[in-house]
Amino acid sequence: MPLPKFMIIATLALCLALTGCTQRPSDGSTCAECHRGLEQVSASHLECVSCHGGNPLAAAEKAAHRRMFGPKNPADPKYWEKTCGKCHPYQLERVRANLMYTNTGMIKNSQATWEGEDGVLYATRAEAVHDAGGEPLKLQKVTQLDNLAGELYRKTCSLCHVGVDSNRVWSGSHSSGCAACHFPYNDNATYQGSDRTVKGKWKHSASHKMAVLPDNSVCVRCHNRSGRIALSYEGWNDGNNSKVPTSKGHLGERVISGARNATRIQPDIHHEKGMECIDCHTSRDLMGDGYVYENMYLQTEISCEDCHGSATERPQVEEIDRENEEVLRESAHYPRRMQQGDSMVLTAKGRKYSNVLQEQGKVWVQSKRNGKLHESKVITDTPEHTIVGHERMECYACHSRSVAQCYGCHTEYDQRELGEDFIKGYKTPGRFTETEDYRMLYPFPLALNQRGKVSTVTPGCQTFVTVIDSRGRKVRDEYVTLFKGRQQLRFAPFFGHNTGPKAIGCAECHANPAFLGFGQHVVEDSSIEATLICEKSEDKPLDGYLTMQYGRV
């Protein structure tokens, strides 16, 4: 008796489903016949077509690759809803609202410091998301921002955000979408695995094996410019004359993107102890929590006080009391998985860390990669942290070893030349070039930050803009852009990621005018005279935001 047609269809569907859930390409797949030696993504990922698409039964290359996603990167935002998002919808929704993808904060601050905000929140792509209060929000695509601030972002800053495949910068390239962090490039963006069909080819991740826990090399591919936090953390500096060989005409100890020579400085104490970026930063810091924030400090959920306590309060803890808590899922990839009943330290937003716990009254940080436990010193009620008048000090105001400071950014925009628009994907009239006056690490000025606390600050940004129109006329010449309605040099609150165990001494901080915002000065009698004077602001030092006349600030 012949089987009913619906039973045949159901049986075929079941077979396809089962073969799609195998951990390696099935015997019927032709993928492995060409891609011999290709690394398995992970033990839990499905067969090739589940991520890449294509036809696994075709023998000819063109036929097999037809309708592939990418084809090299199925994690690109063009395809991620059909690929990564099918199995990881929760993570995808978080990343779609994440600052490293939307760049809303970077775009907004570019507007604020160049031509002013217009009340619209722009992003790398138009997205329907939710704001920090949970209200629906429509982000507008930054290609609609048709002014100098929009041009600046699209032609310079945007190359680092995870929505763009940045593959043209030696040692600074990365893939796009989820692959930007989880399938990292090497310095040349070439594949170095065992599959001979793509061995040494550009542009590919270094391996086909997924980096579940991205290492510091992933972070440094983007965070090596601007605030240079990835460099500072590991103890590198690309300061003044970084393109000049440093010893007997030879290159420096480390060459980084842009043919810059990086030299050694004292690294962050956490790096010295063997901690990586991911040991402090949570997945919500890096991938977002599903809500759109207008600035980085609003998305970041960690603080020094989380692990070390404040002057008056110890670190806050909470037990894992549910079997489906996110902590348990995330820590499954660590050498020591957290268990129900563990007392987990809370972030500044009141969420549990997945690797920081309290045991027998002590706070321990587990390195996510190797499982090493680091005891976190709690400073609560110690004499040196309860000094009267220091209540408003951020921890890093005293404990920063250095802060990257770039003074005098001279930006030229020439409409006679073409510049690559990385968001539009093609060249348009208008090319940016930049030079700087002076770079330094120490001393660094202090000022109030967004939390109302005394914080380290850095120029952000001191931009002198020259605009040349299509006829070669200088429309603007070394123009100091407006900020809050007037021309002024600006400083921005900034944590330099170069922390030391020993604080700056009392005399050093209180007797050095640079820490107070007067810049580096020569003190003579009752007057303070700047040694770095800005030609566009004769009464204001380039490296300070305060001036003094007749004993008054």
Language-model segments: residues:
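Bacterial N-terminal signal peptides that target proteins for export
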Residues: M1-A10
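Short sequence/structural segments immediately N-terminal
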Residues: C21-L373, I387-V553
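Accessory cap/linker subdomain of secreted extracellular hydrolases
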Residues: L373-I379
